[in-house]
């Protein structure tokens, strides 16, 4: 196989959304699987809606997801001269023509066709008139009037369009700017793109683009159209389904590898395997396993998967990842070694970094700033519970050395010597140390806090 070149071509009229990100992931994986190239094009010809802030956001989102691209991004807004060269060639070769029909006249033609039960389209009035350029005139491609345009879609199989139903599409607008389909064809050809993966809302553009490739004598890439992502109600995914822009998922504490894994599984499968490393995805990815059916977005499954990735992240790496989220709540300067242990203690139940940062607060806060849950205090800090805490305080203070292992031994000995069950001492100790009934292993918590802070918290609980 010759070198595979894929592309991702977002429009900077908004932030990168999940559908676009999935397309980018599929295209990136296909290129990396074959050791090819993945190129990036910014389709910014809509001058009114395109904004630099969206371009920056898209590039940042791609980088965060780990989707590196080859070469520099190509910007359509800087290539108008190139597009016009190709349009002028089509005009010179008689494969395109000038048209003076107004939008109102074209709409009237379409209405007439509808009334006759025909495909609504431009009727070719200017096709053979030999007009020259002039104010208000557009350039149209001479599409074949008979036959079919057929291509083998990498996802959907063979797709055929009757040429009689295709328009003589506009390739240059009256203001001199190229249209979407013309620009895309010129770009993909000059960028060496061999495979185009995109959403199936582009299927109807494909025959038009194939006709342009053929008219220009350019090699036609392979096309694959993936079904859209649906919400739980089987409607097109939108914000009302809980979907966010990619940059928002970063800010809410998702790990990029979890989001990439989840997006890949929305439309691609490899047996029953759910979780993949990036290297596994590159090795196993194939367009043969892309689904023809639309996939449903499940935010709860995404959170579950992210939790799996959090638990597998080494504690020191996780500490670095969660630190920016702690900084937002005033805990950004925590000692690295302390934070590493704390992250390891709390990661088992966290689904995202925001949740992890919030859960860690009881061990990060100052001892005199620990917040107590009133119901937990009432339930656990009874006279009996306070008695156990007082006795345990004496035992902890008397230890020659103090760490998590020592704390565990003291607890075990106290329970055994007094004929107790752990549930008699666990809840009051947990409330004293963490302010609530839930949390990680108590011995590990005391090892993290150290003797001085453990005793300080026991003293504060005794004074409640």
From Swiss-Prot:
The keyword Cell membrane does not apply. ATP binds at residue 239. A motif ('HIGH' region) lies at residues 10-20. Keywords: Aminoacyl-tRNA synthetase, ATP-binding, Cytoplasm, Ligase, Metal-binding, Nucleotide-binding, Protein biosynthesis, Zinc. InterPro entries: aa-tRNA-synth_I_cd-bd (IPR045462), aa-tRNA-synth_I_codon-bd_sub2 (IPR020751), aa-tRNA-synth_I_CS (IPR001412), aa_tRNA-synth_I_cd-bd_sf (IPR008925), Glu-tRNA-ligase_bac/mito (IPR004527), Glu-tRNA-synth_I_codon-bd_sub1 (IPR020752), Glu/Gln-tRNA-synth (IPR000924), Glu/Gln-tRNA-synth_Ib_cat-dom (IPR020058). Its cofactor is Zn(2+). Pfam families: Anticodon_2, tRNA-synt_1c. A motif ('KMSKS' region) lies at residues 236-240. Its EC number is 6.1.1.17. One of its GO terms (biological process) is glutamyl-tRNA aminoacylation. GO terms for molecular function: ATP binding; glutamate-tRNA ligase activity; tRNA binding; zinc ion binding. It catalyses: tRNA(Glu) + L-glutamate + ATP = L-glutamyl-tRNA(Glu) + AMP + diphosphate. Its main location: cytoplasm. It comes from the Bacteria. One of its GO terms (cellular component) is cytosol. Zn(2+) binds at residues 99, 101, 126, 128. It is found in: Cytoplasm. Binds 1 zinc ion per subunit. Catalyzes the attachment of glutamate to tRNA(Glu) in a two-step reaction: glutamate is first activated by ATP to form Glu-AMP and then transferred to the acceptor end of tRNA(Glu). Belongs to the class-I aminoacyl-tRNA synthetase family. Glutamate--tRNA ligase type 1 subfamily. Monomer. NCBIfam families: gltX_bact (TIGR00464), PRK05710.1-3 (NF004314). This is Glutamate--tRNA ligase. The gene is gltX.
